[in-house]
Design a protein with these regions (language model features):
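Multi-pass alpha-helical transmembrane bundle typical of ion/small-solute transporters
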Residues: 1-242
């Protein structure tokens, strides 16, 4: 849906908190690098190239998280104690989340299955699911904190709707991490990985529902701000001839 009113950015420069967060994101991505050394043989080159797809998958996941984080600080520019605390926990979880994410990608690309013990899949999906849920629930908590500060931030009706959308979006995405770790311990462990594809469902429904609310709010705001057009003036009376 075309947006008639854009979300106002309250941050006009990069804060120390956001700069520090970017450094942590960059460090986390450096841990995903396929190899720190250039291949010295044809065999090493092939091994390095086999790691490109898992790296690309992990890189894409981190870009999604980084973009969500960047948009949050750009829009709200909140640097109070609760936001700093939530951001610190998020960065810690991301650093811990790096290696399970990388190993999960390698397993999915058939590079690490030989090293996976019989009960290893249960442990792997549990660790990955917890990390996945925590990342998106922490983002949801950060958006919820911004929504609690809506009066102080002077969020208009459209911005409040969009903030609630981000809360619900991150909450529902995080639920799939919990659903995955429950499935891997159920009689249907084979669906523990495929369940993540169902993220497309809330990613479709939530923007549709809140998009309609946003459109209605935009129309109300535009109607309220539109200048009143003067009504048709009464015709002047002609002087009477008598």
């Amino acid at each position: 849906m075309a947006r008639l009113i854009e979300f106002r950015n309250r941050a006009h420069e990069v804060s120390r908190l956001e700069a520090f967060s970017d450094v942590v994101f960059g460090f986390a991505m450096s841990l995903l690098v396929v190899s720190l050394e250039a291949p010295k043989s044809y065999h090493e080159l092939l091994e390095t190239l086999r790691g490109v797809l898992p790296f690309a998958f992990c890189f894409f996941i981190f870009i999604i998280i980084w973009f969500e984080h960047h948009a949050l600080f750009k829009r709200y520019a909140l640097h109070d104690t609760p936001m700093i605390a939530l951001n610190t926990v998020l960065l810690f979880v991301i650093l811990v989340y790096v290696y399970p994410l990388k190993y999960m990608a390698q397993v999915a690309m058939h590079r690490a299955r030989a090293d996976l013990p019989r009960d290893g899949a249960v442990v792997l999906f549990t660790i990955y699911g917890i990390g996945f849920a925590l990342v998106f629930w922490l983002l949801a908590a950060m958006y919820a904190h911004a929504y609690r500060r809506r009066e102080r931030l002077a969020l208009n009706e459209v911005e409040r709707i969009e903030t609630r959308e981000r809360i619900y979006d991150n909450l529902f995405v995080g639920l799939f991490g919990v659903l995955s770790l429950l499935l891997v311990r159920s009689p249907w462990p084979q669906f523990a990985g495929f369940v993540y594809f169902l993220i497309a469902v809330p990613k479709t429904i939530i923007p549709t529902v809140f998009g309609r609310k946003r459109t209605a709010a935009e129309r109300r705001m535009l109607a309220a701000s539109a200048p009143e057009l003067p009504g048709p003036s009464a015709p002047e009376e002609s002087p009477a001839h008598g």
